[in-house]
Amino acid sequence: MIKELMNMKEIKNGVWPVMITPFTADNQIDYDAVKAIIDWYVENGVAGVFAVCQSSEMFFLSKEERLSLAKCCIDYCHEKGVGVVVSGHVAEAVEDQIAEAQAIIDMGADSYVFISNQFGAPEDSEEVVKERIEYLLSRIECDSFGIYECPYPYKRVISPELLKWIASTGKFAFLKDTCCSLDQLKAKCEAVKGTALKIFNANGATLLESMRMGVAGYSGVMANFHPDLYAWLCEHYADEDKQEMVQEMMDYLGAASTIECQVYPINAKYHMNLVGVPMTLVSRTKNPELLTCGVPVKCDGDAFPSSKIMEIDQFCAVEKIMRKYFFG
């Protein structure tokens, strides 16, 4: 295990956005916008990027698109000096999963991230999951893996007991946790103590308390809206002289995180335009009219934007107020 830990790339503490995929008007991946998003992440203090995940609409990308997107993100993140972990673990056949994982690893990802629900059907026991993880590890050449408790097509939350075993393999460095339970997070932090496996919380409301328990940072939807605010919290959560501001930031981030229940990821794509990262609202998972209601985003004359568009406009305005309050 010592040799494996020496070869494992560092997964830095902090913010790891779940990267959205921008598309052109004719529904192709917009690689110029992909790079612009990464630039924006880096400018806003992220530790790394989680690419080709559910927010990336990976279930709606072809194999060729998943691999092409992975290579673009890996190469550009390396160029920008920021970490990158990659999934794309959606193939049905296990041998196809192995081949695709190896291809992404060979591109230079810091860690290849398995989807936990791909380890077995909902009714399968954790013993079955262990056997399947062991098989994958025996077939894939890689020093660093991760796991994402992806909620689609069903959510398989890793138990603290299983996580302890996973960490003991010495092969895992990253867990994107979606349990949203402080009791479970506390037990999971205990389970990985003293190992290389770091837990990243996907839930905004529980983030502060979970970091006090040992969680390494945030990897969730809201890093597509204000990664800088999450980065500030991750950096200062333990500062004794800032605890009042830390709690105020947490209160804002927890309340603001409810916007992900609106029309994500389309609202995130619209928000990107508001902060200077242009892209279409095209998505393969939702109709943009769920956000726009068929009304042009920029209205002239007697037309008015949809209420959901106005919500994101107002959301962005409040973000600016919060930045002024916290950063001056």
Predicted ranges, named:
Residues 42, 209-328:
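Structured C-terminal cap/extension of enzyme domains
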Residues 49, 85, 112, 174-175, ...:
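A local structural micro-motif
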Residues 2-157, 291-294, 313:
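Active-site beta->alpha loop and helix N-cap motifs at the rims of alpha/beta catalytic domains
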Residues 113-130, 176-192, 216, 299-308:
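Repeat-unit-sized solenoid/scaffold elements
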Residues 135-143, 150-264:
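Catalytic alpha/beta core domains of metabolic enzymes, predominantly
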Residues 69-70, 132-133, 194-195, 237-239, ...:
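Short alpha-helix boundary/capping motifs
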